[in-house]
């Protein structure tokens, strides 16, 4: 099975590396305007495969994407320190206007997996440019924010993060919504579990975890210029869900006809992900405050996409 990655920067190359380590695909093709960069990353990652799985990693052109089951769109300009994801819009929308048609010319049956920030709006841009059914254009959305939320809760409660079930919805960015009301640990409501564990969550604890999730990307960007390992692993996990027709539930971004009264917006909700992309949405139980926060997040994304004409 072939996977394409358009954009061989930090996110694209980290995704290719994660795919190779996980053995998700048989072939990974890196496409980039900077052919030398794509070739260098491909060769370096290929040299890691003897220690992992037999994956053929190579650089190529758009034509080499033919037959790809999934294509990761990681092309674009990097987020600058202090820059919000929504401020990236004008620059990255222009990139997608060139990239999306060329990808679909070579791989018309592929699921498009959008990684370029601001990912929710770029998912909407890719969807409008592609003419594909909504489920075939999937954004990485809040998969990383959800992972951060679960990891911080697990750290506080001293349990494995795999036992924590909690979601971050809406924008992958400043207006994201941490869903505390329906969070569970081992099937037990979060607050009940925390009390039983002797680790009751005070308002200060919740505020600290919220800040830890919401500001993580900014701290990392300030320290080293970009985030890529976490999202690379997350994207590889989404690719595996597509290639294996897993039908797992992930907080990914997709075009949504209506959410909390806001029409035609791309944002993250728990989605069932399989071979055809998004196959359904699992709308979680939300408190009134969370519903209002999700509505505001949807409005922000809707306005940003509308300003671009998408």
Curated annotation (Swiss-Prot):
Q: Where in the cell is it found?
A: Cytoplasm
Q: Which reaction does it catalyse?
A: (S)-lactate + NAD(+) = pyruvate + NADH + H(+)
How activity is regulated?
Answer: Allosterically activated by fructose 1,6-bisphosphate (FBP).
User: Is Oxidoreductase found in the keyword set?
Assistant: yes
The annotated thermal profile of this protein reads: Optimum temperature is close to 90 degrees Celsius.
Reply yes or no: does the keyword Ribonucleoprotein apply. Answer: no
Q: Which UniProt keywords apply?
A: Allosteric enzyme, Cytoplasm, NAD, Oxidoreductase, Phosphoprotein
NCBIfam families tied to this protein: L-LDH-NAD
Name of the protein: L-lactate dehydrogenase
User: Species name for this entry?
Assistant: Thermus thermophilus (strain ATCC 27634 / DSM 579 / HB8)
Write the lineage as a comma-separated list.
Bacteria, Thermotogati, Deinococcota, Deinococci, Thermales
Gene transcribed to yield this protein: ldh
């Amino acid at each position: 099975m072939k996977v394409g990655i358009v954009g061989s920067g930090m996110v694209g190359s980290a995704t290719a590396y994660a795919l190779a380590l996980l053995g998700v695909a048989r072939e990974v093709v890196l496409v980039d305007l900077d052919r030398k960069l794509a070739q260098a990353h491909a060769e370096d990652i290929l040299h890691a495969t003897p220690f992992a799985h037999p994956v053929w990693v190579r650089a190529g052109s758009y034509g080499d994407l033919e037959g790809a089951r999934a294509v990761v769109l990681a092309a674009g300009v990097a987020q600058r320190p202090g820059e919000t994801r929504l401020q990236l819009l004008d620059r990255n929308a222009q990139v997608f206007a060139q990239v999306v048609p060329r990808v679909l010319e070579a791989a018309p049956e592929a699921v498009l997996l959008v990684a370029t920030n601001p990912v929710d709006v770029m998912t909407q841009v890719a969807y409008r440019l592609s003419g594909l059914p909504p489920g075939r254009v999937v954004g990485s959305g809040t998969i990383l924010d959800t992972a951060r939320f679960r990891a911080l809760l697990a750290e506080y409660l001293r349990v494995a993060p795999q036992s924590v079930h909690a979601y971050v919805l809406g924008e992958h960015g400043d207006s994201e919504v941490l869903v505390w009301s329906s969070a569970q640990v081992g099937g037990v409501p979060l607050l009940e579990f925390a009390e039983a564990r002797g680790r009751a969550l005070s308002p200060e604890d919740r505020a600290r975890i919220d800040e830890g999730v919401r500001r993580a990307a900014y701290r990392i960007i300030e320290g080293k210029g970009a985030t890529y390992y976490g999202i690379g692993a997350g994207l590889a996990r989404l690719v595996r869900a597509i290639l294996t027709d897993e039908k797992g539930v992930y907080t990914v971004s997709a075009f949504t006809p209506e959410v909390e009264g806001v029409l035609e917006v791309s944002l993250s909700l728990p989605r069932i992900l399989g071979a055809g992309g998004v196959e359904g949405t699992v709308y979680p139980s939300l408190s009134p405050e969370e519903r209002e926060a999700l509505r505001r997040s949807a409005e922000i994304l809707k306005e940003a996409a509308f300003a671009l004409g998408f």
